[in-house]
A protein has these predicted regions:
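Extended beta-strand/beta-hairpin segments
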Residues: 1-52, 60-137
Length: 137
């Protein structure tokens, strides 16, 4: 688990058109746009990865919360739906689907929210500093 002051880096390389490849440690994945907007539809859109990051982080945080309390999760699915407002989401709704009884799930939600890096980042927006890399001549 990361601590304050640690950092994490991924690199996106533009592949032409509306396609990019993201390198995250030893993993890489395609990012693209649908054909109707000029993409080649060879991978999810950036906003889908964004929502997927939130949903998966929250799912893992719920699993952590359950394990910490000795609760076995029979199954778990978290969906994220973002409502567009211009070039951003104005609201994102997370829905937790599990056969775990509600009285066992409810106490897991607050601890999961406390440790989910993605939802915490969205709740407390970081500064975004865009700069050009140094060019070596």
């Amino acid at each position: 688990m990361a601590r304050s002051g640690d950092s994490n880096e991924v690199v996106a390389r533009w592949e032409g058109g509306w396609r990019a490849t993201v390198q995250a440690g030893p993993f890489s994945f395609a990012v693209d746009e649908p054909e109707e907007v000029g993409g080649t539809f060879t991978g999810p859109m950036p906003t889908e990865y964004f929502l997927g990051s939130l949903a998966s982080c929250y799912a893992l945080a719920l699993a952590w919360s359950a394990r910490k309390r000795g609760i076995e999760l029979p199954d778990l699915e978290v969906s994220a739906v973002g409502e567009y407002d211009g070039p951003r989401f104005k609201q994102i709704r997370l829905t937790v689907n599990t056969s775990l009884p509600v009285e066992q799930l409810e106490p897991l939600l607050a601890p999961a929210s406390r440790v989910c890096y993605v939802s915490n980042t969205l709740a407390h927006a970081p500064e975004i500093d865009v700069r050009q890399a140094d060019v070596c001549a």
